Every structure is written in structure tokens, then in C-alpha cells.
Amino acid sequence: MMLEHVLVLSAYLFSIGIYGLITSRNMVRALMCLELILNAVNMNLVTFSDLFDSRQLKGDIFSIFVIAIAAAEAAIGPAIVSSIHRNRKSTRINQSNLLNK
């Protein structure tokens, strides 16, 4: 793929993720939008790593670290949402003020 196509796709994924993160009221949807943002960042890291110096794999290695963080978030996030749903009977972000009680 050409550089412009990858960057446009990455910007599109990032903007969808930001829009969904800002407007979502459901915690599960917010987690999915956060995953979109992280995937867009990974696409940029790999693309620019290949563009500037294809012999060094700094962007690729950093992308693997971001994937590991996203995997941890994908494993722990739904467990936290499940626990909040069990205690509060809701997964809406604006109804879960956990610092009050």
C-alpha cells in the first residue's frame, strides 16, 4: 500500500475511535473505541518505521509493546466492567460515579 493510503486509513480509524470515546455512554463501547485508537497508533508506528529506516525495527518493536498493552486492557477492561455491572446494575459511564461511595 502507498503511504498516503495507510495514513488516511489510520487517521480514519483514530477519528472514529476518538469520536466514539467522546460520545459513548457505555463502558464496553468506550473500550472498543480505545482499541480502535490503539490500532491506528500501531499502523502509524509500523508505517513510519518502514518509511524512515526499514533496517531498524524500532517502530515495529514499540508496536508490539502497544499490542501487549492493548491485550492487557482487553483482558482486564471487561472484567472491571463486569464487576461494575454486578454491583451497580449499569454499565453507563455517566451513572457510575465510583468515587462517591
Curated annotation (Swiss-Prot):
GO BP field: ATP synthesis coupled electron transport; photosynthesis, light reaction
Membrane topology qualifier: Multi-pass membrane protein
Pfam families: Oxidored_q2
GO cellular component, one term: NADH dehydrogenase complex
Transmembrane regions: 2-22, 32-52, 61-81
Keywords for the protein's UniProt record, in alphabetical order: Chloroplast, Membrane, NAD, NADP, Plastid, Plastoquinone, Quinone, Thylakoid, Translocase, Transmembrane, Transmembrane helix, Transport
Organism domain of life: Eukaryota
Localization, UniProt: Plastid, Chloroplast thylakoid membrane
Entry EC no(s): 7.1.1.-
GO molecular function ontology, one term from the record: quinone binding
Reaction(s) catalysed (UniProt annotation): a plastoquinone + NADH + (n+1) H(+)(in) = a plastoquinol + NAD(+) + n H(+)(out); a plastoquinone + NADPH + (n+1) H(+)(in) = a plastoquinol + NADP(+) + n H(+)(out)
InterPro entries registered for this protein in UniProt: NADH_UbQ_OxRdtase_chain4L/K, NUOK/Mnh_C1-like
Family per similarity comment: Belongs to the complex I subunit 4L family.
Subunit structure of this chain's protein: NDH is composed of at least 16 different subunits, 5 of which are encoded in the nucleus.
Role this protein plays: NDH shuttles electrons from NAD(P)H:plastoquinone, via FMN and iron-sulfur (Fe-S) centers, to quinones in the photosynthetic chain and possibly in a chloroplast respiratory chain. The immediate electron acceptor for the enzyme in this species is believed to be plastoquinone. Couples the redox reaction to proton translocation, and thus conserves the redox energy in a proton gradient.
UniProt protein name: NAD(P)H-quinone oxidoreductase subunit 4L, chloroplastic
Organism the protein comes from: Chloranthus spicatus
Gene name, Swiss-Prot/TrEMBL: ndhE
